Amino acid sequence: MSTDWLLGLTHRPERPGDIVAASLSLSVAERTSADQQLLAWHIEAAGYKVRHVPSTLPDIFKTKAMLDWEYASQQKERLTVAYKAMQEQLKWLSSGVSDYEIAIPIHELEACASGTAYYKGLDKSIRDEQLMFIANECEQMFPRLRIFLFNAHKLFSAPVTIFGPSLAVIYVGQCYLSFREAERVKSLSGHFDWLVREATIDARDVPSYIRGLIK
């Protein structure tokens, strides 16, 4: 990612510091507070399409059992807050105020199904329940929810969410980089469109594909 891409210096008359302040901001991604920030961004994008590439499986579709496992080393209060935030985000999605597109690398679902990589040691019943929940939600909410699966051997994407035409957010672990400059948002939207065009599994076929992973 070049400095010119971040700042748009070649086409902007403002001072670099002013450009950064206007187009780029950082938000701490501590899990519970980040969930509240994400919900606020989703609400802000009401009426616009939201596009999302998650870092693992989509948080918005994680079951309580999956969150219990992920938060095993955290305080119980954090799990409670996180689960409530996920429910609020799912309620927002179910309201139909915005179309939602998600692009997921196929290997993430395969790893969950087989209990390998990130999901090593996670009980099969929890993994199966998680996959079935995603498949069911994807089927019930189609077409306002569309999930596309891509081959990470051919395509790559950092975790990113584009909230309509005015905001794009990249997740970098400890913080979120958020962009509000139109050209930066447009560029990331184009990146997501590329993932969709090159997807191996189309949205219509995702529910049956996921169910086929459960053995």
Predicted regions and their residues:
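Compositionally biased, low-hydrophobicity segments enriched in charged and small polar residues
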Residues: 24-31, 101-103
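Basic, Lys/Arg-rich alpha-helical nucleic-acid-recognition elements, primarily the DNA-binding modules
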Residues: 1-24
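Surface-exposed acidic, glycine/proline-enriched linker/cap segments
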Residues: 31-41
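Hydrophobic protein-protein interaction segments
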Residues: 42-214
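Residue-level signal for secondary-structure boundary elements
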Residues: 18, 31-32, 200-204
